[in-house]
């Protein structure tokens, strides 16, 4: 497997196809995750999204904040995203490694959504502390993963991606307990409600954990 699956194999048009699903339940998951963040925005926030892909979530949230910056490791994603976001003047997508963040400014809201802790292969507790360093006083970080109640729909969605040739064939002997493994080496883990609570507690920051739509689990960390 290549070092970064999303940068090398699942980017731009291929990543766009991931979200063109035939499953209404999966579409509701996409919408509910965004809606949870949106209800915390008042229109004045400076927002950063980590692992933003081609800007799918950015486009939905841009009307609800002052401006939104997204970073992604893939130049192809950013090139595709510039066209995707062409009519969104307060959104900017840039190439940056989420493990080597280079910002002089801080943000009111930092997002790490769509199971980003797994996709970016982070050490969750260490990365939460890095994220909080990007937040202005009074700001929040939103980190999401999958609810255990969404497992069957999530698995069907990943089978759909494999059938489209976007992922390798799913290895059903190894796929279990919130972890999806493909025969091409791709692996997607999960942070459960219990995991998120443990991370939040160990971080030392004010936090809450919420299940949304029985599809997402959110860790919301506040910087005072």
Task: Go through the PLM ranges and name each one.
Residues 1-42:
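Conserved class I S-adenosyl-L-methionine
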Residues 51-53:
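Class I SAM-dependent methyltransferase "Motif I" SAM/SAH-binding loop
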Residues 56-100:
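Class I SAM-dependent methyltransferase SAM/SAH-binding core
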Residues 102-110:
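A short acidic, Gly/Pro-enriched loop at the edge of an enzyme's catalytic core
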Residues 109-123:
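A short SAM/SAH-binding and catalytic strip from SAM-dependent methyltransferases
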Residues 125-137:
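A short glycine-rich, Lys/Arg-flanked "PGG" loop and its adjoining helix->strand segment in the class I
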Residues 142-199:
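SAM-dependent methyltransferase
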Residues 211-224:
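Core SAM-dependent methyltransferase catalytic element
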